[in-house]
Design a protein with these regions (language model features):
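Extracytoplasmic gate region of multi-pass secondary transporters
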Residues: 34-35, 220-274, 362-363, 367
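Helix-loop-helix hairpin linking two adjacent transmembrane segments in secondary transporters
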Residues: 143-192
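Juxtamembrane intracellular "pre-TM" segments in multi-pass secondary transporters
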Residues: 3-9, 193-226
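Cytoplasmic membrane-interface "Motif A"-like loop-to-helix N-cap segments
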Residues: 76-87, 282-296
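Conserved MFS/SLC helix-loop-helix module at the cytosolic interface between two early adjacent transmembrane helices
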Residues: 65-104
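Cytoplasmic helix-loop-helix junction between adjacent transmembrane helices
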Residues: 103, 109-148
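Helix-to-loop junctions at the C-terminal end of transmembrane segments
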Residues: 66-78, 273-286
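Extracytoplasmic
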Residues: 15-49, 239-245, 362-367
């Protein structure tokens, strides 16, 4: 771990955290833009449903696989240097995507964006742990998460309006400029104080960090947790961030702005959901029953959305999913209750990595299902959503069947 830093004033700490939160806002925007970008990209670049799914998944794949590297960087180099070195890749990826003329270039842009955004939330949590009192960690982290959700508001109606009046290239261009402004703000505003004199310094090697993560799999309940983490968050972001827009446009002939309005409503419904579940859910290991129950409820909701082809019903189901989406944060409470303090940090890192690699897996597999569906006389969106529902049930079953913490 990095040595403890000298204390910051409350005003200075909040000012720096707000600047860092802007990178997190943009990471949320980039991970959810496929729902609105999907239809124009499909039309202009002749993308198949499978290619669209793979493109959206590329962000989450890059984001997920870079979590260990970013965690090590934070320990060795600190918050400021980690985000300043990584985030230019987001700017470059967005700029490259705005000029893409082929699927391959679009994929490279998406991989760069995902890599650059990888430390966006980690730097916030590490900064909070270093510069806020321990009792403030959860409420301040929750505030940052709520701020971050505004990124998905940007990629709802505002992005749809911009694309409808210009093109999808302008969407990437505006996000690239926003990322550049954010980088400059962080460069100007975020300056962590030097470590206190005499503070011990321990810097883990990459191999030691990987060994520590792999050691968690010797605990029998880790497998169930990872199986669940791979599918829970993935279902929400795959619908909100990938299939919602194309489904509404193709099934019901919604305009891009109309589908953006639905995405906006779904996002607004989800903003207060984590805080709600944090208040009503039981503490400790009782969370396990809640996690399994909510996964089953959401899987049934997704299956209903797949089979009921009525516009108002699909819109209502999407908003209901937003209201229920906060159940996923209960995984963090489960980790806190199940793992000893000595390995809790690594367990949380593993959970985060599994969540984002799961999004990549979910989007790729649902894209494959959508691509194969017409050959069997099945609507692509029906196949994609039923596949997602089945994967969520499988993850919940593994979580129930394997030993608990």
């Amino acid at each position: 771990m990095s040595p403890p830093a000298a204390p910051l004033s409350t005003r200075a700490a909040w000012g720096m955290l707000l600047a860092l939160s802007c990178a997190f806002i943009l990471s949320q925007a980039f991970r959810s833009l496929a729902a609105i970008m999907g239809p124009p990209l499909t039309q202009d670049l002749q993308l198949s449903a499978q290619e669209l799914g793979n493109w959206s998944a590329a962000y989450h794949f890059a984001f997920g696989v870079m979590q260990v590297a970013m965690g090590i960087s934070l320990d060795v180099w600190g918050v400021r240097r980690t985000i300043l070195l990584a985030f230019p890749l987001t700017i470059a990826g967005a700029a490259l995507s705005s000029q893409a003329g082929s699927y391959g270039v679009l994929m490279w842009g998406q991989l760069l964006i995902g890599t650059g955004c990888a430390p966006a939330f980690l730097v916030c949590t590490v900064f909070i742990s270093r510069h806020f009192a321990p009792a403030r960690f959860t409420p301040v982290s929750g505030t940052v998460m709520s701020i971050g959700y505004s990124g998905m508001l940007l990629t709802a109606t505002p992005l749809a309006w911009l694309i409808a009046r210009t093109s999808w290239r302008w969407g990437f261009g505006v996000l690239a400029v926003a990322a550049l402004v954010t980088w400059l703000w962080i460069f100007w505003r975020v300056h962590e104080p030097a470590p206190e004199p005499g503070a011990p310094t321990r810097r883990p090697s990459p191999m030691a960090a990987l060994t520590g993560l792999m050691a968690l799999f010797r605990l029998p309940y880790t497998r169930g947790l990872v199986a669940y983490a791979l599918v829970a968050y993935a279902t929400y972001i795959t619908i909100r961030g990938l299939w919602l827009g194309p489904l509404l446009v193709d099934r019901f002939d919604f305009s891009l702005v109309q589908s953006g309005n639905v995405a906006l409503a779904m996002t607004l419904a989800s903003i207060g959901s984590p805080a709600l579940f944090g208040r009503i859910a039981p503490a400790g290991r009782g969370l396990r029953r809640w996690l399994i129950l909510m996964a089953v409820v959401v899987a049934l909701l997704i299956a209903t959305m797949a089979l009921v082809r009525v516009a108002w019903a699909d819109v209502l189901l999407a908003v209901c999913f937003g209201l229920l989406s906060g159940y996923m944060v209960l995984q963090y409470g489960y980790v806190h209750a199940s793992y000893p303090a000595a390995v809790r940090g690594r367990a949380l890192s593993l959970l985060t990595m599994a969540m984002f690699l799961g999004v990549s897996l979910m989007q790729s597999v649902s894209g494959i299902a959508a691509g194969l569906a017409p050959g069997f006389g099945v609507e692509p969106f029906t196949a994609a959503l039923l596949t997602m529902s089945a994967l969520l049930l499988a993850g919940a079953f593994a979580f129930w069947k394997w030993p608990q913490g």
